């Protein structure tokens, strides 16, 4: 087998780059043990804008946390990529490749907004295309259920957006656990939901309320008895957001 | 070719600003079919003694005392002898501190009636964004708006400035100001500026909490932690890794931590909306270390960063005049009975119909 830094050098060619996230580069790669199987490598490069001490600490912590969470979830019923291999020192994680679109892109396609919501202006009053409503609803309810299962496993994602849920054969798979952590606290789960709500509002502004309703419908269907406390906290977090004094 | 003139009044926090702007329209059908001239931009800041913040009542009194003189100076400098020739009076309708906003809107209503000129209420945040776009020439950037009361990551979509990320509790400028109060760092010209100067001499990095939640962030925990360190420093027993920590080290560590968080959420928003440009606005935006860090991040994404200097970053009247005039040219006017100010006025409430 080739050593990892060498491997990375071979990988890090532009043609292998699948995505440039906020803090990681995702390359398609060969599985380290099963050469016929395709997988991806998530690499956290050094961030020269921040202090080396802080950067090293964050990269190591997040790579480890992501791997731990993926490993924990591998035994449960939440759909996440399989963890293949980790090299925390070099900030590398090998994992299963999920084929499909992100929910963000899929919704934009469904809405007929191919160039991307945040970059394009459109008419404000457009209604949802009739034929697509049921597939949008079904999918978002499923996404909500997946998030519910995640919280039921006491995992908080930390960055729930429609970019971080993929659709594989129409079934949602949650990805990118770089900011994830283990928590049983209703407060942490509520902040997770608040982040999701805000991301939907900004990314899919025209029908955000409807989309959130569907997500929560799915979420509430699976979380069970812990839901009361989480939803109550969510109300608190929303208030905090709204009340924030806005001077300046 | 048509020209339009607007006078803007800003007083949502401790700066009182009045500015006059001129738009010369060459192509009325194009979004960018006009040029902008800044005829005057006058500001007076209410400065409190070290260790104290500015209270609404005292700030409002400062604005009342100065507003007439500042308006006169702005008109003189703009060489406007007949103010009835102005096309609109723009004023900050919110968000901000209640009492200071109130005292300035009274001035706005008065001159509008004296001169028979329509009023236009402006959202403070939109004022910052529009001024930043105009000065830097950034066309469709992700905007990081950082000031004493606001911390937001914004991108334009479908006629609104959408908030992608923001603070879940206190603003970054508030965090810096309150830290400055503990160490009695002077408030002139601004606490943030003095922290920036001290931070340049800091060497030892003291680890602080790092709390990013997706595109949002939280800073109250960082503040509490660094305040407790500052108090230990004042008591003379702050040693980390065998190193005697100085006030400079604390300023340095606080800046590095907060700004790393800000750059990270901005980068996350850029990745999320596929944008290559960043624009930094708001008072904290004139911090050169923040601009430098943002520049490194943008460069690594093959993008670019746009920032302005203190004339436009720090609250000013010209940005209000500018955003007000953009709205007025679309036929927007705030009727006298609708000119109440509001402390809470979300950036995404404004219909941005001057952009496509």
UniProtKB/Swiss-Prot annotation, chain A:
<keyword id="KW-0723">Serine/threonine-protein kinase</keyword>
<dbReference type="InterPro" id="IPR011009">
    <property type="entry name" value="Kinase-like_dom_sf"/>
</dbReference>
<comment type="function">
    <text>Component of the EKC/KEOPS complex that is required for the formation of a threonylcarbamoyl group on adenosine at position 37 (t(6)A37) in tRNAs that read codons beginning with adenine. The complex is probably involved in the transfer of the threonylcarbamoyl moiety of threonylcarbamoyl-AMP (TC-AMP) to the N6 group of A37. BUD32 has ATPase activity in the context of the EKC/KEOPS complex and likely plays a supporting role to the catalytic subunit KAE1. The EKC/KEOPS complex also promotes both telomere uncapping and telomere elongation.</text>
</comment>
<keyword id="KW-0010">Activator</keyword>
<dbReference type="GO" id="GO:0005524">
    <property type="term" value="F:ATP binding"/>
</dbReference>
<dbReference type="GO" id="GO:0008033">
    <property type="term" value="P:tRNA processing"/>
</dbReference>
<dbReference type="InterPro" id="IPR002575">
    <property type="entry name" value="Aminoglycoside_PTrfase"/>
</dbReference>
<keyword id="KW-0808">Transferase</keyword>
<dbReference type="GO" id="GO:0000408">
    <property type="term" value="C:EKC/KEOPS complex"/>
</dbReference>
<dbReference type="GO" id="GO:0045944">
    <property type="term" value="P:positive regulation of transcription by RNA polymerase II"/>
</dbReference>
<dbReference type="Pfam" id="PF01636">
    <property type="entry name" value="APH"/>
</dbReference>
<dbReference type="GO" id="GO:0005634">
    <property type="term" value="C:nucleus"/>
</dbReference>
<feature type="region of interest" description="Disordered">
    <location>
        <begin position="113"/>
        <end position="132"/>
    </location>
</feature>
<feature type="binding site">
    <location>
        <position position="42"/>
    </location>
    <ligand>
        <name>ATP</name>
    </ligand>
</feature>
<dbReference type="GO" id="GO:0000781">
    <property type="term" value="C:chromosome, telomeric region"/>
</dbReference>
<keyword id="KW-0067">ATP-binding</keyword>
<keyword id="KW-0597">Phosphoprotein</keyword>
<dbReference type="GO" id="GO:0016887">
    <property type="term" value="F:ATP hydrolysis activity"/>
</dbReference>
<keyword id="KW-0418">Kinase</keyword>
<dbReference type="GO" id="GO:0106310">
    <property type="term" value="F:protein serine kinase activity"/>
</dbReference>
<keyword id="KW-0547">Nucleotide-binding</keyword>
<dbReference type="GO" id="GO:0070525">
    <property type="term" value="P:tRNA threonylcarbamoyladenosine metabolic process"/>
</dbReference>
Curated annotation (Swiss-Prot), chain B:
<feature type="binding site">
    <location>
        <position position="177"/>
    </location>
    <ligand>
        <name>substrate</name>
    </ligand>
</feature>
<dbReference type="GO" id="GO:0046872">
    <property type="term" value="F:metal ion binding"/>
</dbReference>
<dbReference type="InterPro" id="IPR043129">
    <property type="entry name" value="ATPase_NBD"/>
</dbReference>
<feature type="binding site">
    <location>
        <position position="124"/>
    </location>
    <ligand>
        <name>a divalent metal cation</name>
    </ligand>
</feature>
<feature type="binding site">
    <location>
        <position position="287"/>
    </location>
    <ligand>
        <name>substrate</name>
    </ligand>
</feature>
<feature type="binding site">
    <location>
        <position position="196"/>
    </location>
    <ligand>
        <name>substrate</name>
    </ligand>
</feature>
<dbReference type="GO" id="GO:0000408">
    <property type="term" value="C:EKC/KEOPS complex"/>
</dbReference>
<keyword id="KW-0479">Metal-binding</keyword>
<keyword id="KW-0808">Transferase</keyword>
<dbReference type="InterPro" id="IPR017860">
    <property type="entry name" value="Peptidase_M22_CS"/>
</dbReference>
<dbReference type="GO" id="GO:0002949">
    <property type="term" value="P:tRNA threonylcarbamoyladenosine modification"/>
</dbReference>
<comment type="similarity">
    <text>Belongs to the KAE1 / TsaD family.</text>
</comment>
<feature type="binding site">
    <location>
        <position position="128"/>
    </location>
    <ligand>
        <name>a divalent metal cation</name>
    </ligand>
</feature>
<keyword id="KW-0963">Cytoplasm</keyword>
<dbReference type="GO" id="GO:0008252">
    <property type="term" value="F:nucleotidase activity"/>
</dbReference>
<dbReference type="InterPro" id="IPR000905">
    <property type="entry name" value="Gcp-like_dom"/>
</dbReference>
<dbReference type="GO" id="GO:0045944">
    <property type="term" value="P:positive regulation of transcription by RNA polymerase II"/>
</dbReference>
<dbReference type="InterPro" id="IPR017861">
    <property type="entry name" value="KAE1/TsaD"/>
</dbReference>
<dbReference type="GO" id="GO:0000785">
    <property type="term" value="C:chromatin"/>
</dbReference>
<dbReference type="Pfam" id="PF00814">
    <property type="entry name" value="TsaD"/>
</dbReference>
<keyword id="KW-0805">Transcription regulation</keyword>
<dbReference type="InterPro" id="IPR034680">
    <property type="entry name" value="Kae1_archaea_euk"/>
</dbReference>
């Amino acid at each position: 087998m080739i050593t990892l830094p060498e491997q990375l050098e071979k990988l890090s060619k532009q043609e292998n780059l699948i995505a440039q996230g906020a803090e990681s580069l995702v390359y398609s790669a060969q599985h380290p043990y099963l050469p016929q199987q395709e997988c991806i490598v998530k690499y956290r490069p050094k961030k020269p804008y921040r202090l080396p001490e802080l950067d090293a600490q964050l990269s190591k912590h997040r790579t480890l946390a992501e791997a731990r969470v993926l490993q924990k979830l591998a035994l449960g019923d939440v759909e996440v990529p399989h963890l293949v291999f980790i090299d925390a020192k070099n900030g590398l994680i090998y994992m299963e490749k999920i084929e499909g679109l992100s929910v963000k892109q899929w919704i934009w396609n469904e809405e007929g907004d191919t160039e991307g919501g945040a970059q394009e202006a459109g008419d404000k009053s457009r209604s949802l295309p009739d034929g697509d409503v049921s597939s949008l609803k079904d999918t978002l309810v499923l996404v909500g259920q997946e998030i519910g299962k995640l919280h039921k496993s006491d995992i908080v994602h930390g960055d729930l957006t429609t970019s971080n849920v993929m659709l594989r054969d129409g079934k949602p798979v949650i990805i990118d656990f770089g900011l994830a952590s283990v928590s049983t606290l209703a407060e942490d789960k509520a902040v997770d939901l608040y982040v999701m709500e805000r991301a939907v509002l900004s990314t899919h502004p025209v029908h955000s309320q409807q989309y959130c309703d569907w997500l929560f419908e799915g979420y509430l269907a699976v979380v069970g008895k812990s839901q009361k406390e989480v939803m109550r906290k969510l109300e608190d977090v929303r208030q905090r957001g709204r009340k924030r004094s806005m001077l300046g | 070719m048509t020209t339009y003139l607007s006078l803007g009044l800003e007083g949502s926090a401790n700066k009182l600003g009045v500015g006059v702007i001129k738009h010369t329209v060459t192509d009325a059908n194009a979004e960018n079919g006009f040029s902008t001239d800044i005829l005057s931009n006058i500001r007076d800041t209410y400065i409190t003694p070290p260790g104290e913040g500015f209270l609404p009542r005292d700030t409002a009194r400062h604005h009342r005392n100065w507003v007439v003189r500042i308006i006169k100076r702005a008109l003189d400098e703009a060489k406007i002898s007949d103010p009835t020739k102005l096309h609109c009076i723009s004023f900050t309708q919110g968000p901000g501190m209640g009492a200071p906003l109130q005292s300035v809107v009274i001035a706005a209503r008065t001159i509008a009636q004296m001169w028979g000129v329509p009023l236009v209420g402006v959202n403070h945040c939109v004022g910052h964004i529009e001024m930043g776009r105009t000065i830097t020439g950034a066309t469709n950037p992700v905007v990081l708006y950082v000031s004493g009361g606001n911390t937001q990551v914004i991108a334009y979509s479908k006629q609104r400035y959408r908030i992608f990320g923001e603070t879940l509790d206190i603003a970054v400028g508030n965090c810096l100001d309150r830290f400055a109060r503990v160490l009695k760092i002077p408030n002139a010209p601004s606490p943030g500026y003095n922290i920036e100067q001290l931070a340049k001499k800091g060497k030892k990095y003291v680890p602080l909490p790092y709390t990013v939640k997706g595109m949002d962030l939280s800073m109250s925990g960082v503040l509490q932690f660094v305040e407790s360190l500052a108090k230990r420093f004042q008591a003379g027993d702050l040693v980390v890794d065998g190193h005697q920590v100085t006030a400079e080290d604390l300023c340095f560590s606080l800046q590095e931590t907060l700004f790393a968080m800000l750059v990270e959420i901005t980068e996350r928003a850029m990745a999320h909306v596929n944008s290559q440009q960043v624009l930094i606005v708001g008072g904290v935006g004139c911090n050169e270390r923040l601009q430098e860090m943002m520049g490194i991040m943008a460069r690594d994404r093959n993008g670019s960063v746009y920032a302005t200097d203190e004339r436009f970053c720090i609250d000013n009247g010209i940005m209000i005049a500018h955003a007000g005039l953009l709205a007025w040219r679309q036929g927007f006017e705030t009727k006298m009975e609708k000119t109440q100010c509001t402390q809470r006025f979300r950036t995404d409430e404004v219909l941005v119909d001057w952009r496509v």
